Design a protein with these regions (language model features):
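Generic alpha-helical transmembrane segments
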Residues: 708, 753, 775-789
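Membrane-water interface at loop-to-transmembrane-helix junctions
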Residues: 732-751, 771-776
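Membrane-helix interface and helix-disruption motif detector
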Residues: 766-770
Length: 870
């Protein structure tokens, strides 16, 4: 069966209506029952309560729940209550972060206007868009939203903005002509209109062929529902980390419990040791700390024009190895600009126009007069190609409005897509003159003369050939070319179409949406950082390739392809194909998803940028979807993890740099937490093996994990950013947080902390006072971890350099933490709550001294390890 664009309007009417007449009332009712309302449907969503319950599925949380229950059974109600409060607070925080209203489909619904003008019973009547059905004939005027997909029946100079669906920035000229080719991309189906687009110029009518979820917008809605959001590398890492840590904790707890029972301890005490170990090992505040650090990251990125909608995207950007970028407005300025003139037989850069040259001056003035656009106080109204001509005149010192007042328009033949030209009549220095603007081939066929240096000559075949070659050269460079001509006409008559002949060729004007000034440098920085930039656009291949070459994405033409080529490939073939392609043109939403997925299956973290409705499914499929804030549709913003408020590719590179630094800082926070916890675990194990009392009560460990540890961990997450991260390659997708080097650091640092803690415990226990020993061990562990924060600034020695003082947050966290632990062990009113006793001044100084020793010891370890790495 042929596609609708391959059929005439009458054939399509017979196909969907059974005749060439509008629908009858009975047919309308039947079709509405058959096809349903013209609406987009949404899938079932999880309730907030379901999301809240899912927060308790984490292995670490389950272990904490068991620890709380065990503490309660053993009579330690305070510890059990604190653990439950911590778990609940983390669950609430996780729920708040997860509950993001999935409003993409709601935004898609807004793309249709509330009403449509439908021909029924021979009368045009407005009806709600939801009541439009297959077979309806819709009447369109400039400014109307198109409520459904359909085949054009009547067309009077129609131009449709389809940018939301295709990504093409210019309005598409429509026609009623049949298209013979098979598998024509959506952007080239010039006899069809689609829901989600709107008429910018002209008028016409169309017969509805698809409604609701069967429209092109509906297909995008279906893709949004079936495209699952991927976890960021950090989420995957933390999940894996949680599972591994849970297994380790359970193994350690089982070993400790077995040793205690084997040594003759009663089961109650053995359980207490196991619970203490579990609480010591689990970094209860980790989830909250990561969230807080990421939140601070979003604030920093917002100042740099990147608004983060999904918190984990902050870090995820740092892992990106492929950036698939839209062209228009992201890599380019999204503003048509004149690049070259061809006049007097030569190509001239736009900024080199000489207004003293009569032909150059006439061409510039003609481009202002034969033009319907305006630019008043910076507000541009009209077709982008026409506003580009106005803006050039302004930049060269010509006031377009003054030119138009001096040479007012007396008559015109408006532009239409069949003639591909427009003409206006003016009195130029007392001579009635018709100025004509249009497609190069059309004007050349109507030209008998050519002007050079103010003189008119009969045009020769050689001159035509040179002009055509220049036009082809501009086109190969991705430039949009307009030809200008003129001739003297009668003073007393209105222009007619017959006047548009025997013209004097004046010149060509070539324009394009040029690259942003910063795009080339951003692409180069991208490559230096080991990230491959790829252009994906709905625009034409020649235009896309020209821009990509100028900014360094494309090196040769073989690296560019069109969406039609992708249709012929299987997913496996596409996986091999993407390696050699840097530019994709004329692509559909399905193509974009397949390209993103192909790179993901090759082990890459993919960021996708976009602004149109057509980009939304790929934005959701990508690891990090990035939408445009200025030109972007609400649908694309809803589907994205991040929104660029300046629509600038260079901003993505800044975000990647932030993401890499934030990951590095989060890793430092995790190292800080785990090394401290490992020190506590070793202390508990040592006490158990040496038949000593439990060195810590669960409340001690919770105090450390939630209060004195949290502040330094957050401060490490705010560590000043390194300028060297963009010289590194993206980290591998399968790289775990728990690398061999990372685990060695944790082990050595934990051993140092444990040693100082057990020395303090031994000093306190010399008279058999278990409470004093526990208090000194607790205080030393707390202070050791506060000092250890400075160790975690880097895996290289930093304490004896000026870098030790470059994080004011860490210094503040250290001071606050030291004050808190000092208050706990010196204020009597807090003793019962925290299961401690008062320490004397000498005991306090002993605690401080032992804790401080961790600094030089660990710094020496780092220095030795750094030397061996070389």
């Amino acid at each position: 069966m042929k596609a609708y664009y391959q059929l005439s309007g009458e054939e399509v009417l017979r196909e969907v209506n059974g005749s060439e007449e509008p629908l009858t009332k009975e047919q309308i009712s039947e079709n509405q029952r058959k096809y349903g309302p013209n609406e987009l449907t949404e899938g079932k969503k999880k309730t907030t309560f379901q999301i809240f319950l899912e927060q308790y599925k984490d292995f670490l949380v389950i272990i904490l729940i068991i620890a709380a229950i065990a503490s309660g059974f053993m009579g330690d109600i305070e510890s059990a209550a604190v653990i439950v409060i911590v778990i609940t607070m983390n669950a609430i925080l996780g729920t708040v972060q997860t509950v993001k209203a999935e409003s993409s489909l709601a935004s898609l619904k807004k793309l249709s206007g509330p009403e449509a003008k439908v021909l029924r019973d021979g009368v045009v009547v407005p009806i709600p868009s939801s009541e439009v059905t297959v077979g309806d004939i819709i009447m369109l005027e400039a400014g109307d939203y198109i409520p459904a997909d359909g085949r054009i029946l009547e067309c009077a100079s129609m131009k449709v903005d389809e940018s939301a669906l295709t990504g093409e920035s210019l309005g598409v000229e429509k026609t009623t002509d049949v298209i013979e080719q098979d598998e024509v991309p959506l952007g080239d189906r010039i006899n069809m209109v689609y829901s989600g687009s709107f008429l910018t110029y002209g008028r016409g009518s169309f017969v509805v062929t698809e409604i609701g979820m069967n429209t092109e917008v509906g297909k995008i809605a279906s893709l949004l529902k079936t495209t699952s959001e991927k976890k960021t590398p950090l989420q995957v890492n933390l999940d894996q980390f949680g599972q591994k840590l849970s297994i380790l904790i359970l193994v350690f707890c089982a070993i400790l419990f077995g040793i205690s029972v084997f040594r003759g301890e009663n089961i109650g005490n053995a359980f207490l040791f196991a619970v203490a170990l579990a609480v010591a090992a689990i970094p209860e505040a980790l989830s909250s700390i990561v969230t807080i650090v990421l939140s601070f990251g979003t604030q920093k990125m917002a100042k740099e024009h990147a608004t983060v909608r999904k918190l984990q995207a902050v870090e995820g950007l740092g892992s990106v190895s492929i950036i698939c970028s839209d062209k228009t407005g992201t890599l380019t300025q999204n503003k048509m600009t004149v690049e070259h003139y061809y006049v007097d037989g030569q190509s001239i850069s736009a900024d080199k126009i000489d207004l003293r040259d009569p032909s150059q001056s006439r061409l510039l003035i003609s481009s202002i007069l034969c033009n319907d656009s305006t630019n008043i106080d910076g507000v541009e109204i009209g077709d982008p190609t026409e506003t580009a001509l106005i803006n050039l005149g302004s930049s060269l010192g010509l006031d377009p409005e003054e030119v138009r007042v001096k040479y007012p328009r007396e008559s015109e033949n408006p532009f239409d897509s069949d003639r591909k030209m427009m003409a206006t009549k003016h009195s130029l220095n007392g001579v009635p003159t018709m100025i004509v603007k249009g497609a190069v081939d059309v004007l050349l066929n109507r030209t008998d003369w050519v002007e050079m240096k103010g003189e008119t000559y009969e045009i020769t075949e050689e001159t035509r050939r040179v002009i055509e070659e220049q036009n082809q050269k501009y086109s190969r460079e991705g430039l949009r070319v307009l030809a200008f001509a003129y001739k003297e006409v009668s003073d007393e008559t209105e222009l007619t179409l017959e006047d548009e002949d025997h013209l004097i060729f004046l010149g060509l004007i070539a324009m394009m949406d040029p690259p942003r000034e910063e795009s080339k440098a951003a692409v180069e920085e991208c490559k230096c950082a080991g990230i491959r930039p790829i252009m994906i656009t709905g625009d034409h291949k020649v235009t896309a390739a020209a821009i990509a070459k100028r900014i360094g994405i494309l090196e040769n033409e073989s690296e560019a392809c069109e969406g039609a080529e992708i249709d012929k490939m299987s997913d496996e073939e596409l996986k091999d194909f993407v390696e050699g392609i840097s530019v994709y043109a004329r692509v559909s939403p399905e193509h974009k998803i397949r390209i993103v997925r192909a790179w993901q299956e090759k082990g890459n973290i993919v960021s996708m940028t976009g602004d149109g409705v057509n980009d939304a499914p790929a934005l959701k499929q990508a690891d990090i979807g990035v939408a445009m804030g200025i030109t972007g549709s609400e649908v694309s913003k809803d589907a994205a993890a991040m929104v660029l408020t300046d629509d600038n590719f260079a901003t993505i590179i800044k975000a990647v740099e932030n993401g890499r630094n934030i990951y590095r800082n989060i890793k430092a926070s995790i190292q800080f937490l785990l090394s401290g916890n490992f020190g506590a675990i070793l202390a508990v194990l040592y006490a158990s093996l040496m038949a000593l009392p439990v060195p810590f009560a669960p409340v001690h460990l919770l105090f450390i994990n939630l209060l004195t540890d949290s502040l330094p961990a957050i401060a490490l997450g705010l560590e000043p950013h390194s300028k060297n991260v963009m010289k590194e390659k993206p980290r591998p997708i399968n790289e775990s947080i728990l690398t061999k080097d990372f685990l060695i650091n944790i082990g050595l640092e934990g051993l140092s902390i444990c040693t100082m803690v057990m020395i303090a415990f031994t000093i306190g226990y010399k008279d058999g006072n278990a409470l004093l020993a526990s208090t000194m061990a607790f205080a030393t562990l707390c202070c050791s971890r506060l000092f250890h924060g400075f160790n975690c600034k880097s895996n290289r020695p930093v304490v004896f350099t000026k870098r030790v003082f470059n994080n004011i947050y860490l210094i503040g966290a250290f001071v606050i933490g030291m004050i808190l632990i000092t208050l706990v062990v010196t204020v009597p009113g807090l003793h019962n709550i925290f299961k401690v006793q008062t320490l004397t001044l000498s005991q306090l100084l002993t605690v401080y001294g032992l804790a401080a020793l961790n600094l030089p010891i660990i710094q020496m370890i780092k220095a030795v390890r750094a030397k061996f790495r070389k």
